Regions:
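A detector of tandem-repeat and repeat-rich interaction/domain scaffolds
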Residues: 252-266, 271-275, 279-286, 290-304, ...
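Conserved core positions of repeat-based scaffolds
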Residues: 1-2, 11, 40-43, 52, ...
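Short glycine/serine- and acidic-residue-enriched loop/turn motifs that recur at repeat junctions
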Residues: 3, 10-27, 51-68, 92-131, ...
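Glycine-centered loop/turn positions within well-structured domains
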Residues: 144, 162-163, 195, 229, ...
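Repeated scaffold domains used in trafficking and secretory/extracellular systems
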Residues: 30-34, 38, 71-75, 79, ...
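Acidic surface patches and DE-rich sequence motifs
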Residues: 4, 45, 56, 86, ...
């Protein structure tokens, strides 16, 4: 943002990324899944190809490049990176050439030495993801990706560029979120920021973090959904309970009256629920219209982001309530403003 001498404001738009425009995304007729990747939206099509559109930061130059992806069966994102599960059970990730250094490492080593150390450690950190096979589901957190295997066990890996957060000898996250190797009889996995949650086939929960007392009482969990630090679950009777509550300033956690739910999507400050009859409801922040979904019908999948909600219809169309986050920057020039003297 730039303030001119005449009192007007100039606002630059962020860079566009992806292989499609938003108009092209909304004209897709063979979509099966949508995933928010920060300020971008990625859509998986029936042919195993991925279409995406949105805005990228300068350091995310390659983070939306998916043109070479083929035979994708599932997408997952942690807002920064996009991952694709391939039909043969292997996993792809959008390219990231940089490094991410924790504040503690910077403080300890100083910037120059920290960067030198980070580059060296990234080179020797095992790339565990490249060796994965027979994966049937993936979930991504801040420092870890978790894969559910066909036999009900799980594998996990840290991201080599996360210096100070990933053990460069083992390739596992230092926060303990990769400690899933002893889990069995799993039905679903959910990677959050600093934690991984597992749902067993008997409806009980596992976590790599400290187990909350109330979780120990659950034996009827049907599915788990979440993002970042927030997680919610659908029970066998179709009701919803929050496992890790979100910021409730806008009522995001007000799901106690929901029934007949089959899927949830947790956004930045809103929660979306898909009913078994294909209708959708949402609660929380609605500043961009992201909760205006009550008229939707025949929906089979939902995704919630910062300022938007996406629904995939039975016939493969993509519906959007709200906006892409980058669409906040819709004006190049704002009206004149007065600036106090001094």
């Amino acid at each position: 943002v730039c303030l001119k001498q005449d009192g007007t404001l100039l606002v630059t738009e962020p860079d566009l990324g992806g292989n499609s425009t938003m108009e092209e995304i909304l004209s897709i007729t063979d979509a099966v899944q949508a995933v928010w990747q920060g300020e971008s939206l990625a859509v998986l099509c029936k042919d195993g190809m991925v279409r995406n559109a949105g805005y990228v930061e300068y350091w995310q130059e390659y983070a939306t490049e998916v043109n070479d992806w083929r035979n994708v069966s599932m997408l997952a994102s942690n807002n920064s990176d996009l991952f694709g599960l391939i039909k043969d059970g292997s996993v792809l990730r959008t390219e990231f050439d940089g490094i991410s250094i924790s504040g503690s490492v910077l403080k300890e080593l100083g910037e120059e030495k920290a960067i030198e150390t980070a580059k060296r450690q990234k080179e020797i950190t095992p790339d565990l993801i490249a060796k994965w096979k027979n994966i049937k589901e993936i979930s991504v957190g801040s420092t870890q990706i978790v894969g559910l295997l066909a036999d009900g066990s799980a594998v996990a890996a840290g991201f080599p560029e996360q210096i100070g957060r990933v053990d460069y000898n083992t390739g596992l996250a230092l926060d303990g979120s990769c400690k899933v190797d002893e889990w069995t009889e799993l039905k679903q996995i959910l990677a959050l920021f600093g934690e991984t949650i597992g749902l067993k086939t008997n409806g009980t929960l596992l976590t790599t973090a400290e187990m909350p007392e109330e979780w120990k009482q659950y034996s009827d969990i049907e599915s788990i959904w979440g993002r970042e630090w927030t997680a919610a679950a659908i029970r066998s009777d179709g009701t919803v309970v929050y496992l890790r509550e979100g910021d409730d300033r806008y009522g995001q956690n007000n799901v106690s009256g929901w029934t007949d739910m089959v899927q949830l999507a947790v956004g930045e400050n809103h929660t979306v629920g898909l009913r078994s009859d294909g209708t959708v409801t949402a609660v929380g922040d609605n500043f961009a219209g992201q909760c205006d979904v009550e008229d939707w019908t025949n929906i089979v999948s939902v995704a919630a982001g910062e300022s938007g909600t996406v629904g995939i219809t039975e016939d493969g169309r993509v519906l959007l309530a709200g906006t892409l986050p980058g669409d906040y920057f819709v004006a190049e020039t704002w009206p004149a403003v007065s600036v106090p003297e001094g």
